[in-house]
Amino acid sequence: MPSIKSDIEIARAATKRPIFEIGAKLGIAAEQLVPYGHDKAKVSAEFIAAQAGKKDGKLILVTAINPTPAGEGKTTTTVGLGDGLNRIGKKAIVCIREASLGPCFGVKGGAAGGGYAQVVPMEDINLHFTGDFHAITSAHNLLAAIIDNHIYWGNEENIDIRRITWRRVMDMNDRALRSMISSLGGVANGFPRQGGFDITVASEVMAILCLATDLKDLERRLGDIIIGYRFDKTPVHARDLKADGAMAVLLKDAMQPNLVQTLESNPAFVHGGPFANIAHGCNSVTATKTALKLGEYVVTEAGFGADLGAEKFFDIKCRKAGLRPDAAVIVATVRALKMNGGVKKEDLGTEDVAALKKGCANLGRHVANVRRFGVPVVVAINHFVSDTDAEIAAVKEFVSRLGAEAILCQHWAKGSAGIEELAHKVVELAESGQAKFQPLYGDDISLFEKIEIIASKIYHAGEVTADKAVRDQLQSWEEQGYGKLPVCMAKTQYSFSTDPNLRGAPEGHIVSVREVRLSAGAGFVVAITGEIMTMPGLPKSPSAERIFLNDQGYIEGLF
Protein backbone atom coordinates (compact mmCIF):
# COMPACT_ATOMS: atom_id res chain seq x y z
CA MET A 1 0.00 0.00 0.00
CA PRO A 2 1.55 3.36 -1.00
CA SER A 3 2.31 5.71 1.89
CA ILE A 4 0.15 8.81 2.26
CA LYS A 5 2.09 11.99 1.60
CA SER A 6 2.00 14.72 4.21
CA ASP A 7 0.63 18.17 3.40
CA ILE A 8 4.11 19.64 3.31
CA GLU A 9 5.39 16.89 0.98
CA ILE A 10 2.49 17.50 -1.41
CA ALA A 11 3.03 21.25 -1.32
CA ARG A 12 6.78 20.93 -1.85
CA ALA A 13 6.26 18.71 -4.90
CA ALA A 14 3.84 21.17 -6.53
CA THR A 15 4.64 22.79 -9.86
CA LYS A 16 4.08 26.45 -9.11
CA ARG A 17 3.47 28.98 -11.85
CA PRO A 18 5.24 32.37 -11.68
CA ILE A 19 3.01 34.74 -9.73
CA PHE A 20 2.81 37.12 -12.72
CA GLU A 21 1.02 34.35 -14.65
CA ILE A 22 -1.53 33.97 -11.85
CA GLY A 23 -2.07 37.73 -11.85
CA ALA A 24 -2.51 37.70 -15.63
CA LYS A 25 -5.40 35.23 -15.23
CA LEU A 26 -7.20 37.99 -13.31
CA GLY A 27 -6.18 40.79 -15.63
CA ILE A 28 -3.59 42.17 -13.22
CA ALA A 29 -0.62 43.56 -15.13
CA ALA A 30 2.86 42.71 -13.87
CA GLU A 31 3.55 46.33 -12.90
CA GLN A 32 0.47 46.26 -10.61
CA LEU A 33 1.94 43.39 -8.58
CA VAL A 34 4.56 43.83 -5.86
CA PRO A 35 6.40 40.48 -5.91
CA TYR A 36 7.73 38.75 -2.80
CA GLY A 37 9.88 36.20 -4.59
CA HIS A 38 8.53 34.22 -7.56
CA ASP A 39 5.36 32.74 -6.04
CA LYS A 40 3.62 35.46 -4.02
CA ALA A 41 2.86 39.13 -4.52
CA LYS A 42 0.83 42.02 -3.20
CA VAL A 43 -1.76 43.69 -5.41
CA SER A 44 -1.26 47.44 -5.65
CA ALA A 45 -3.75 49.86 -4.13
CA GLU A 46 -3.90 51.70 -7.47
CA PHE A 47 -5.10 48.59 -9.29
CA ILE A 48 -7.71 47.89 -6.62
CA ALA A 49 -9.08 51.44 -6.77
CA ALA A 50 -9.42 51.16 -10.57
CA GLN A 51 -11.79 48.17 -10.25
CA ALA A 52 -14.49 50.09 -8.36
CA GLY A 53 -16.97 50.36 -11.23
CA LYS A 54 -16.99 46.69 -12.17
CA LYS A 55 -19.87 44.31 -11.45
CA ASP A 56 -19.49 41.95 -8.50
CA GLY A 57 -19.32 38.18 -8.86
CA LYS A 58 -21.12 35.67 -6.64
CA LEU A 59 -20.02 35.39 -3.01
CA ILE A 60 -19.90 31.92 -1.42
CA LEU A 61 -19.25 31.42 2.30
CA VAL A 62 -17.70 28.21 3.62
CA THR A 63 -18.41 27.56 7.29
CA ALA A 64 -18.64 24.45 9.49
CA ILE A 65 -20.15 22.60 12.41
CA ASN A 66 -18.54 22.79 15.86
CA PRO A 67 -15.09 21.30 15.28
CA THR A 68 -12.73 18.86 16.90
CA PRO A 69 -9.42 20.38 18.12
CA ALA A 70 -7.80 19.46 14.77
CA GLY A 71 -10.38 21.37 12.70
CA GLU A 72 -12.71 19.89 10.10
CA GLY A 73 -11.14 21.00 6.83
CA LYS A 74 -12.95 24.28 6.26
CA THR A 75 -9.97 25.95 4.60
CA THR A 76 -9.25 22.73 2.69
CA THR A 77 -12.84 22.75 1.43
CA THR A 78 -12.66 26.45 0.55
CA VAL A 79 -9.55 25.85 -1.56
CA GLY A 80 -10.96 22.65 -3.04
CA LEU A 81 -14.24 24.33 -3.97
CA GLY A 82 -12.37 27.18 -5.65
CA ASP A 83 -10.47 24.62 -7.72
CA GLY A 84 -13.69 22.69 -8.37
CA LEU A 85 -15.48 25.77 -9.69
CA ASN A 86 -12.56 26.52 -12.00
CA ARG A 87 -12.61 22.89 -13.12
CA ILE A 88 -16.25 23.19 -14.29
CA GLY A 89 -15.49 26.37 -16.21
CA LYS A 90 -16.21 29.13 -13.72
CA LYS A 91 -13.73 31.92 -13.02
CA ALA A 92 -13.35 31.44 -9.28
CA ILE A 93 -11.07 33.06 -6.71
CA VAL A 94 -10.36 31.79 -3.20
CA CYS A 95 -10.18 34.26 -0.28
CA ILE A 96 -8.80 32.94 3.01
CA ARG A 97 -7.04 34.24 6.10
CA GLU A 98 -3.35 34.25 6.87
CA ALA A 99 -1.97 31.75 9.36
CA SER A 100 -1.05 32.64 12.93
CA LEU A 101 2.11 31.15 14.42
CA GLY A 102 0.12 30.32 17.58
CA PRO A 103 -1.84 27.34 16.19
CA CYS A 104 1.00 26.43 13.79
CA PHE A 105 3.20 25.64 16.77
CA GLY A 106 0.30 24.74 19.07
CA VAL A 107 -2.27 22.07 18.18
CA LYS A 108 -4.37 23.02 15.15
CA GLY A 109 -1.62 23.41 12.56
CA GLY A 110 -1.42 25.85 9.67
CA ALA A 111 -4.07 27.55 7.59
CA ALA A 112 -3.17 26.76 3.99
CA GLY A 113 -5.56 23.85 3.44
CA GLY A 114 -4.49 20.23 3.22
CA GLY A 115 -3.81 17.28 0.95
CA TYR A 116 -4.41 18.18 -2.69
CA ALA A 117 -6.48 21.25 -1.78
CA GLN A 118 -3.84 23.70 -0.61
CA VAL A 119 -2.58 27.17 -1.34
CA VAL A 120 1.14 27.49 -1.94
CA PRO A 121 3.86 28.34 -0.98
CA MET A 122 2.52 26.51 2.07
CA GLU A 123 5.63 26.93 4.25
CA ASP A 124 5.81 30.68 3.66
CA ILE A 125 2.06 31.19 4.19
CA ASN A 126 2.17 29.30 7.50
CA LEU A 127 5.24 31.15 8.79
CA HIS A 128 6.25 34.76 8.06
CA PHE A 129 4.63 35.10 4.60
CA THR A 130 4.79 38.75 3.43
CA GLY A 131 5.24 40.23 6.90
CA ASP A 132 1.65 41.41 7.45
CA PHE A 133 1.43 40.00 10.98
CA HIS A 134 4.77 41.62 11.85
CA ALA A 135 3.42 44.97 10.62
CA ILE A 136 0.19 44.56 12.62
CA THR A 137 2.08 43.55 15.76
CA SER A 138 4.47 46.49 15.32
CA ALA A 139 1.67 49.02 14.81
CA HIS A 140 -0.22 47.71 17.83
CA ASN A 141 2.83 47.76 20.10
CA LEU A 142 3.92 51.19 18.84
CA LEU A 143 0.67 52.53 20.27
CA ALA A 144 1.35 50.72 23.55
CA ALA A 145 4.84 52.27 23.71
CA ILE A 146 3.45 55.74 22.95
CA ILE A 147 0.90 55.38 25.78
CA ASP A 148 3.54 54.63 28.43
CA ASN A 149 5.90 57.24 26.97
CA HIS A 150 3.14 59.88 27.15
CA ILE A 151 2.55 59.08 30.82
CA TYR A 152 6.31 59.12 31.56
CA TRP A 153 6.72 62.61 30.09
CA GLY A 154 4.02 64.26 32.18
CA ASN A 155 0.71 62.72 31.11
CA GLU A 156 -0.71 65.82 29.40
CA GLU A 157 -3.90 63.90 28.51
CA ASN A 158 -4.51 63.00 32.19
CA ILE A 159 -4.71 59.28 31.40
CA ASP A 160 -5.80 57.22 34.40
CA ILE A 161 -3.29 54.35 34.40
CA ARG A 162 -5.84 52.21 36.24
CA ARG A 163 -8.16 52.49 33.23
CA ILE A 164 -5.78 51.82 30.32
CA THR A 165 -7.45 49.19 28.14
CA TRP A 166 -4.78 48.85 25.42
CA ARG A 167 -2.70 45.71 25.93
CA ARG A 168 0.34 44.52 23.99
CA VAL A 169 0.33 41.67 21.46
CA MET A 170 2.54 38.98 19.97
CA ASP A 171 1.84 36.25 17.42
CA MET A 172 2.37 33.27 19.70
CA ASN A 173 0.47 31.20 22.25
CA ASP A 174 2.03 32.20 25.59
CA ARG A 175 -0.12 32.02 28.72
CA ALA A 176 2.69 33.50 30.86
CA LEU A 177 2.07 36.89 29.25
CA ARG A 178 -1.66 37.16 29.95
CA SER A 179 -1.31 39.36 33.01
CA MET A 180 1.73 41.26 34.27
CA ILE A 181 3.06 44.41 35.87
CA SER A 182 5.10 46.61 33.51
CA SER A 183 7.54 49.51 34.10
CA LEU A 184 9.16 47.93 37.16
CA GLY A 185 12.75 48.80 38.10
CA GLY A 186 12.60 52.34 39.36
CA VAL A 187 11.81 55.90 38.31
CA ALA A 188 13.74 55.69 35.02
CA ASN A 189 11.38 53.00 33.73
CA GLY A 190 8.12 54.87 34.13
CA PHE A 191 5.02 54.28 36.21
CA PRO A 192 4.29 50.63 37.08
CA ARG A 193 0.88 49.44 35.98
CA GLN A 194 -0.98 46.22 35.36
CA GLY A 195 -1.20 45.04 31.75
CA GLY A 196 -0.66 42.00 29.59
CA PHE A 197 -0.51 40.52 26.12
CA ASP A 198 -3.10 39.21 23.68
CA ILE A 199 -2.30 37.16 20.59
CA THR A 200 -1.91 39.32 17.47
CA VAL A 201 -4.98 37.83 15.81
CA ALA A 202 -7.10 39.26 18.66
CA SER A 203 -5.68 42.76 18.14
CA GLU A 204 -8.05 45.56 17.22
CA VAL A 205 -5.43 46.60 14.66
CA MET A 206 -5.91 43.23 12.94
CA ALA A 207 -9.67 43.79 12.86
CA ILE A 208 -9.19 47.33 11.54
CA LEU A 209 -6.90 46.14 8.74
CA CYS A 210 -9.50 43.54 7.78
CA LEU A 211 -12.45 45.96 7.79
CA ALA A 212 -10.83 49.11 6.34
CA THR A 213 -11.59 49.91 2.71
CA ASP A 214 -8.49 51.98 1.89
CA LEU A 215 -5.56 53.78 3.54
CA LYS A 216 -7.63 56.85 4.41
CA ASP A 217 -10.26 54.68 6.11
CA LEU A 218 -7.47 52.73 7.82
CA GLU A 219 -5.94 55.86 9.36
CA ARG A 220 -9.36 57.15 10.47
CA ARG A 221 -10.13 53.85 12.19
CA LEU A 222 -6.70 53.74 13.85
CA GLY A 223 -7.33 57.23 15.21
CA ASP A 224 -10.69 56.10 16.60
CA ILE A 225 -9.08 53.42 18.80
CA ILE A 226 -9.82 54.01 22.49
CA ILE A 227 -6.73 53.21 24.58
CA GLY A 228 -8.23 53.99 27.97
CA TYR A 229 -9.86 56.73 29.99
CA ARG A 230 -8.91 59.99 31.69
CA PHE A 231 -9.45 60.73 35.36
CA ASP A 232 -12.72 62.40 34.37
CA LYS A 233 -13.68 59.09 32.65
CA THR A 234 -13.70 60.53 29.12
CA PRO A 235 -12.13 58.25 26.47
CA VAL A 236 -8.59 58.75 25.16
CA HIS A 237 -8.20 58.00 21.44
CA ALA A 238 -5.05 57.01 19.56
CA ARG A 239 -5.25 60.30 17.63
CA ASP A 240 -5.12 62.22 20.94
CA LEU A 241 -1.62 60.76 21.34
CA LYS A 242 -0.75 61.46 17.67
CA ALA A 243 -0.14 57.75 17.09
CA ASP A 244 -2.49 57.14 14.16
CA GLY A 245 -0.24 58.48 11.40
CA ALA A 246 2.79 56.39 12.34
CA MET A 247 0.61 53.29 12.80
CA ALA A 248 -0.82 53.77 9.30
CA VAL A 249 2.70 54.07 7.89
CA LEU A 250 3.62 50.71 9.42
CA LEU A 251 0.49 49.17 7.87
CA LYS A 252 0.71 50.79 4.42
CA ASP A 253 2.01 47.69 2.62
CA ALA A 254 0.09 45.25 4.82
CA MET A 255 -3.18 46.79 3.55
CA GLN A 256 -2.48 45.40 0.06
CA PRO A 257 -3.91 41.87 -0.43
CA ASN A 258 -1.54 38.95 -0.97
CA LEU A 259 -1.95 36.92 -4.18
CA VAL A 260 -0.84 33.28 -4.26
CA GLN A 261 -2.05 30.14 -6.04
CA THR A 262 -3.67 26.80 -5.33
CA LEU A 263 -1.97 23.49 -6.19
CA GLU A 264 -3.97 23.61 -9.44
CA SER A 265 -2.60 27.07 -10.31
CA ASN A 266 -5.81 28.95 -9.56
CA PRO A 267 -5.70 32.40 -7.90
CA ALA A 268 -6.10 32.87 -4.16
CA PHE A 269 -6.03 35.95 -1.96
CA VAL A 270 -4.62 35.29 1.52
CA HIS A 271 -5.02 38.40 3.63
CA GLY A 272 -5.71 39.18 7.27
CA GLY A 273 -6.20 36.63 9.99
CA PRO A 274 -8.45 37.35 12.99
CA PHE A 275 -9.53 34.26 14.95
CA ALA A 276 -13.28 33.64 15.08
CA ASN A 277 -13.45 32.61 18.74
CA ILE A 278 -11.83 35.79 20.10
CA ALA A 279 -12.20 38.16 17.12
CA HIS A 280 -14.40 38.46 14.00
CA GLY A 281 -12.84 35.57 12.09
CA CYS A 282 -12.89 36.77 8.46
CA ASN A 283 -10.31 37.67 5.84
CA SER A 284 -9.98 41.29 4.75
CA VAL A 285 -12.76 43.29 3.14
CA THR A 286 -10.18 44.62 0.67
CA ALA A 287 -9.30 41.12 -0.56
CA THR A 288 -12.94 39.99 -0.74
CA LYS A 289 -14.15 43.09 -2.59
CA THR A 290 -11.21 42.98 -5.00
CA ALA A 291 -11.88 39.32 -5.75
CA LEU A 292 -15.57 40.05 -6.38
CA LYS A 293 -14.56 42.55 -9.07
CA LEU A 294 -12.18 40.08 -10.74
CA GLY A 295 -13.99 36.73 -10.59
CA GLU A 296 -17.36 35.17 -11.36
CA TYR A 297 -17.27 33.33 -8.03
CA VAL A 298 -15.49 34.18 -4.79
CA VAL A 299 -15.16 31.42 -2.20
CA THR A 300 -14.28 32.63 1.30
CA GLU A 301 -14.28 31.08 4.76
CA ALA A 302 -15.11 32.24 8.26
CA GLY A 303 -13.40 30.68 11.25
CA PHE A 304 -14.53 27.73 13.37
CA GLY A 305 -18.22 26.78 13.45
CA ALA A 306 -21.11 28.75 11.98
CA ASP A 307 -22.10 29.88 15.50
CA LEU A 308 -18.93 32.00 15.55
CA GLY A 309 -17.38 32.68 12.14
CA ALA A 310 -20.53 32.69 10.01
CA GLU A 311 -22.52 34.81 12.48
CA LYS A 312 -19.71 37.38 12.53
CA PHE A 313 -19.28 37.19 8.76
CA PHE A 314 -22.97 38.05 8.36
CA ASP A 315 -23.46 40.46 11.26
CA ILE A 316 -20.11 42.28 11.18
CA LYS A 317 -18.28 41.88 7.86
CA CYS A 318 -21.28 41.85 5.50
CA ARG A 319 -23.04 44.59 7.49
CA LYS A 320 -19.96 46.83 7.51
CA ALA A 321 -18.85 46.17 3.92
CA GLY A 322 -22.24 45.95 2.21
CA LEU A 323 -21.65 42.36 1.09
CA ARG A 324 -24.51 40.02 0.14
CA PRO A 325 -23.60 36.30 0.11
CA ASP A 326 -25.29 34.11 -2.51
CA ALA A 327 -24.83 30.68 -0.90
CA ALA A 328 -23.20 28.97 2.07
CA VAL A 329 -21.42 25.63 2.42
CA ILE A 330 -21.41 23.99 5.85
CA VAL A 331 -18.49 21.59 6.23
CA ALA A 332 -19.20 18.53 8.35
CA THR A 333 -17.08 15.50 9.11
CA VAL A 334 -18.18 12.13 10.36
CA ARG A 335 -15.62 12.32 13.18
CA ALA A 336 -16.88 15.72 14.44
CA LEU A 337 -20.49 14.56 14.30
CA LYS A 338 -19.56 11.50 16.35
CA MET A 339 -17.71 13.70 18.84
CA ASN A 340 -20.84 15.86 19.12
CA GLY A 341 -22.72 12.62 19.72
CA GLY A 342 -20.55 11.79 22.72
CA VAL A 343 -17.76 9.64 21.25
CA LYS A 344 -14.33 10.10 22.85
CA LYS A 345 -11.49 11.43 20.71
CA GLU A 346 -9.58 8.15 20.77
CA ASP A 347 -12.63 6.23 19.48
CA LEU A 348 -13.53 8.49 16.53
CA GLY A 349 -12.05 6.03 14.00
CA THR A 350 -14.55 3.31 14.98
CA GLU A 351 -17.96 3.13 13.26
CA ASP A 352 -20.77 4.39 15.49
CA VAL A 353 -23.88 5.30 13.50
CA ALA A 354 -26.00 5.80 16.62
CA ALA A 355 -23.63 8.41 18.06
CA LEU A 356 -23.34 10.07 14.66
CA LYS A 357 -27.13 10.40 14.40
CA LYS A 358 -27.19 11.95 17.86
CA GLY A 359 -24.41 14.37 16.85
CA CYS A 360 -26.30 15.38 13.71
CA ALA A 361 -28.37 17.67 15.92
CA ASN A 362 -25.33 19.95 15.91
CA LEU A 363 -25.32 20.03 12.10
CA GLY A 364 -29.06 20.65 12.02
CA ARG A 365 -28.70 23.66 14.32
CA HIS A 366 -26.03 25.17 12.05
CA VAL A 367 -28.15 24.64 8.93
CA ALA A 368 -31.09 26.39 10.59
CA ASN A 369 -28.88 29.24 11.81
CA VAL A 370 -27.41 29.99 8.38
CA ARG A 371 -30.89 29.90 6.84
CA ARG A 372 -31.96 32.43 9.47
CA PHE A 373 -29.77 34.95 7.62
CA GLY A 374 -31.60 34.26 4.36
CA VAL A 375 -28.73 32.35 2.73
CA PRO A 376 -29.30 28.97 0.98
CA VAL A 377 -27.20 26.08 2.32
CA VAL A 378 -25.50 22.92 1.08
CA VAL A 379 -23.58 20.53 3.36
CA ALA A 380 -20.12 19.28 2.36
CA ILE A 381 -19.10 16.00 3.98
CA ASN A 382 -15.31 16.29 4.12
CA HIS A 383 -14.23 12.68 3.62
CA PHE A 384 -11.82 10.86 5.93
CA VAL A 385 -10.53 7.34 5.22
CA SER A 386 -12.08 6.08 8.48
CA ASP A 387 -15.62 7.08 7.36
CA THR A 388 -17.90 4.12 6.62
CA ASP A 389 -20.63 3.92 3.99
CA ALA A 390 -23.26 3.57 6.72
CA GLU A 391 -22.09 6.73 8.48
CA ILE A 392 -22.02 8.77 5.27
CA ALA A 393 -25.49 7.52 4.33
CA ALA A 394 -26.81 8.53 7.76
CA VAL A 395 -25.53 12.09 7.34
CA LYS A 396 -27.05 12.38 3.86
CA GLU A 397 -30.39 11.08 5.09
CA PHE A 398 -30.44 13.50 8.03
CA VAL A 399 -29.67 16.52 5.84
CA SER A 400 -32.27 15.52 3.24
CA ARG A 401 -34.91 15.61 5.99
CA LEU A 402 -33.92 19.25 6.54
CA GLY A 403 -34.71 20.02 2.91
CA ALA A 404 -31.04 20.42 2.02
CA GLU A 405 -28.41 18.25 0.35
CA ALA A 406 -25.23 16.71 1.76
CA ILE A 407 -22.50 15.95 -0.77
CA LEU A 408 -19.49 13.71 -0.15
CA CYS A 409 -16.30 15.62 -1.01
CA GLN A 410 -12.89 14.01 -1.56
CA HIS A 411 -10.84 17.06 -2.48
CA TRP A 412 -8.18 16.29 0.14
CA ALA A 413 -7.25 13.11 -1.73
CA LYS A 414 -8.31 13.97 -5.29
CA GLY A 415 -8.15 17.75 -5.62
CA SER A 416 -10.78 19.41 -7.80
CA ALA A 417 -11.87 16.05 -9.26
CA GLY A 418 -13.17 15.09 -5.81
CA ILE A 419 -15.41 18.11 -5.37
CA GLU A 420 -17.07 18.63 -8.76
CA GLU A 421 -20.52 17.64 -7.49
CA LEU A 422 -20.38 20.28 -4.76
CA ALA A 423 -19.19 22.89 -7.28
CA HIS A 424 -22.20 22.23 -9.52
CA LYS A 425 -24.56 22.45 -6.51
CA VAL A 426 -23.04 25.74 -5.36
CA VAL A 427 -23.52 27.22 -8.84
CA GLU A 428 -27.14 26.03 -8.82
CA LEU A 429 -27.82 27.66 -5.44
CA ALA A 430 -25.99 30.89 -6.24
CA GLU A 431 -27.75 31.30 -9.59
CA SER A 432 -31.18 30.42 -8.19
CA GLY A 433 -31.77 33.84 -6.64
CA GLN A 434 -32.85 32.20 -3.36
CA ALA A 435 -30.54 34.37 -1.26
CA LYS A 436 -32.38 37.09 0.66
CA PHE A 437 -29.62 38.11 3.02
CA GLN A 438 -30.37 40.05 6.18
CA PRO A 439 -28.40 40.43 9.44
CA LEU A 440 -29.70 38.84 12.62
CA TYR A 441 -30.45 42.12 14.40
CA GLY A 442 -30.85 45.81 13.63
CA ASP A 443 -28.50 48.63 14.58
CA ASP A 444 -30.88 50.46 16.88
CA ILE A 445 -31.49 48.00 19.72
CA SER A 446 -29.30 48.13 22.83
CA LEU A 447 -25.91 46.40 22.98
CA PHE A 448 -27.08 43.98 25.65
CA GLU A 449 -30.15 43.11 23.56
CA LYS A 450 -27.83 42.29 20.65
CA ILE A 451 -25.90 39.92 22.90
CA GLU A 452 -29.18 38.34 24.04
CA ILE A 453 -30.40 37.87 20.45
CA ILE A 454 -27.19 36.12 19.38
CA ALA A 455 -27.27 33.95 22.51
CA SER A 456 -30.93 32.99 22.17
CA LYS A 457 -31.30 32.71 18.38
CA ILE A 458 -27.89 31.23 17.46
CA TYR A 459 -26.71 29.48 20.65
CA HIS A 460 -30.23 28.60 21.94
CA ALA A 461 -29.28 29.87 25.39
CA GLY A 462 -31.96 30.28 28.01
CA GLU A 463 -30.39 33.29 29.68
CA VAL A 464 -27.53 35.79 29.40
CA THR A 465 -25.94 36.86 32.66
CA ALA A 466 -23.62 39.81 33.27
CA ASP A 467 -22.75 41.65 36.45
CA LYS A 468 -23.66 45.29 37.05
CA ALA A 469 -20.23 46.57 35.97
CA VAL A 470 -20.61 44.96 32.53
CA ARG A 471 -24.15 46.27 32.05
CA ASP A 472 -23.14 49.75 33.21
CA GLN A 473 -20.20 49.75 30.81
CA LEU A 474 -22.45 48.87 27.88
CA GLN A 475 -24.89 51.62 28.87
CA SER A 476 -22.03 54.11 29.16
CA TRP A 477 -20.86 53.28 25.62
CA GLU A 478 -24.39 53.76 24.34
CA GLU A 479 -24.47 57.20 25.94
CA GLN A 480 -21.16 58.00 24.20
CA GLY A 481 -22.68 57.14 20.80
CA TYR A 482 -21.50 53.56 20.32
CA GLY A 483 -24.88 51.88 20.75
CA LYS A 484 -25.38 51.19 17.04
CA LEU A 485 -22.27 49.00 16.78
CA PRO A 486 -22.58 45.24 16.21
CA VAL A 487 -21.40 42.77 18.84
CA CYS A 488 -18.48 40.37 18.43
CA MET A 489 -18.89 37.38 20.76
CA ALA A 490 -15.75 35.78 22.21
CA LYS A 491 -16.75 32.20 22.98
CA THR A 492 -15.41 28.65 22.86
CA GLN A 493 -15.48 27.15 19.37
CA TYR A 494 -16.25 23.64 20.58
CA SER A 495 -19.86 24.15 21.68
CA PHE A 496 -22.94 26.29 21.14
CA SER A 497 -22.61 27.04 24.85
CA THR A 498 -19.74 28.60 26.79
CA ASP A 499 -18.77 25.14 28.09
CA PRO A 500 -16.43 23.43 25.58
CA ASN A 501 -17.51 20.02 26.86
CA LEU A 502 -21.23 20.56 26.21
CA ARG A 503 -21.55 18.98 22.77
CA GLY A 504 -24.38 18.50 20.33
CA ALA A 505 -27.18 21.10 20.27
CA PRO A 506 -27.75 22.14 23.89
CA GLU A 507 -30.84 24.15 24.84
CA GLY A 508 -31.52 26.53 27.71
CA HIS A 509 -27.92 26.94 28.88
CA ILE A 510 -26.61 30.14 30.44
CA VAL A 511 -24.22 32.47 28.59
CA SER A 512 -22.18 34.41 31.11
CA VAL A 513 -20.58 37.64 29.84
CA ARG A 514 -17.64 38.34 32.12
CA GLU A 515 -16.07 41.28 30.27
CA VAL A 516 -16.80 43.68 27.40
CA ARG A 517 -14.30 45.60 25.29
CA LEU A 518 -15.01 48.50 22.94
CA SER A 519 -13.20 48.29 19.59
CA ALA A 520 -14.16 51.77 18.43
CA GLY A 521 -11.75 51.71 15.49
CA ALA A 522 -12.89 48.35 14.19
CA GLY A 523 -16.48 49.30 14.88
CA PHE A 524 -17.77 46.60 17.21
CA VAL A 525 -18.11 45.68 20.88
CA VAL A 526 -16.45 42.46 22.05
CA ALA A 527 -18.37 40.41 24.63
CA ILE A 528 -16.09 37.88 26.35
CA THR A 529 -17.91 34.81 27.65
CA GLY A 530 -17.06 31.80 29.77
CA GLU A 531 -13.38 30.95 30.12
CA ILE A 532 -12.25 32.07 26.65
CA MET A 533 -8.81 33.70 26.61
CA THR A 534 -7.54 36.37 24.21
CA MET A 535 -4.03 34.98 24.73
CA PRO A 536 -4.11 31.19 24.24
CA GLY A 537 -1.66 28.76 25.81
CA LEU A 538 0.26 25.88 24.28
CA PRO A 539 -0.92 22.29 24.86
CA LYS A 540 1.11 19.77 26.87
CA SER A 541 2.70 18.45 23.68
CA PRO A 542 2.73 21.31 21.16
CA SER A 543 3.32 20.82 17.44
CA ALA A 544 6.53 22.82 17.87
CA GLU A 545 8.15 19.73 19.41
CA ARG A 546 7.80 17.91 16.09
CA ILE A 547 8.85 20.67 13.69
CA PHE A 548 12.50 20.74 12.58
CA LEU A 549 14.93 21.18 9.67
CA ASN A 550 16.10 17.92 8.06
CA ASP A 551 19.63 17.22 6.80
CA GLN A 552 18.79 18.85 3.46
CA GLY A 553 17.61 22.04 5.18
CA TYR A 554 13.91 21.39 4.48
CA ILE A 555 11.19 21.93 7.06
CA GLU A 556 9.59 18.79 8.51
CA GLY A 557 6.50 18.51 10.70
CA LEU A 558 4.66 21.63 9.52
CA PHE A 559 1.02 20.89 8.66
From Swiss-Prot:
A Pfam family annotated for this UniProt entry: FTHFS
CDD domains (alphabetical): FTHFS
Reaction equation(s) it catalyzes: (6S)-5,6,7,8-tetrahydrofolate + formate + ATP = (6R)-10-formyltetrahydrofolate + ADP + phosphate
Pathway noted in the entry: One-carbon metabolism; tetrahydrofolate interconversion
Keyword Ubl conjugation: no
Positions bound to ATP: T68, P69, A70, G71, E72, G73, K74, T75
The keyword Disulfide bond appears for this protein: no
Family: Belongs to the formate--tetrahydrofolate ligase family.
Protein name listed in UniProt: Formate--tetrahydrofolate ligase
Protein's organism: Rhizobium etli (strain ATCC 51251 / DSM 11541 / JCM 21823 / NBRC 15573 / CFN 42)
Gene name per UniProt: fhs
